[in-house]
């Protein structure tokens, strides 16, 4: 599907579905295309640890050799969830996910125990970025009189 040496390069628009090191899986035209980021994106984004996140809409140029791609453009984000980077990159932003339609938190009543602190943090982050959020409570058959107040409050 890549272009021949005497033809124009093939460009596709897609969505990043996973990120592993310097490789990104981009879903475009019904298939997943392993793609790399161009070096200029890393140099232009010193304030973030990762210039591309899962959920980003991107344009890729297919390579002629092995049907992989090079990410040539990152489209504007509708929203994102991020946190401060840890370790030596403290002060930088680490983007967790981009272009989120909705956030669902699935929490068990027990095993593992319901975690209201995590839920609070998630709901606050969603509200800050105007992302609709919801809660799914799993393992309700394990709810007892002791666990009910912790979950229901």
State the predicted function of each range:
Residues 1-116:
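N-terminal accessory targeting/assembly segments
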Residues 90-153:
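Conserved C-terminal guanine-recognition region of P-loop GTPase G domains, centered on the G4
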């Amino acid at each position: 599907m890549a272009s021949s040496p005497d033809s124009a390069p093939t460009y596709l628009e897609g969505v990043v579905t996973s990120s592993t090191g310097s490789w990104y899986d981009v879903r475009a035209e019904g298939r997943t295309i392993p793609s790399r980021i161009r070096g200029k994106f890393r140099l232009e984004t010193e304030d973030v640890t990762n210039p591309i996140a899962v959920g980003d809409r991107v344009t890729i140029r297919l390579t002629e050799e092995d049907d992989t791609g090079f990410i040539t453009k990152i489209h504007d984000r509708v929203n994102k969830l991020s946190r401060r980077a840890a370790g030596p990159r403290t002060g930088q932003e680490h983007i967790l996910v981009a272009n989120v339609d909705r956030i669902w938190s699935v929490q068990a009543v027990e095993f593992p125990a319901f975690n209201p602190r995590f839920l609070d943090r998630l709901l606050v982050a969603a509200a800050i970025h105007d992302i609709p959020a919801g809660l799914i409570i799993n393992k309700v058959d394990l709810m007892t009189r002791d666990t009910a107040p912790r979950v229901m409050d």
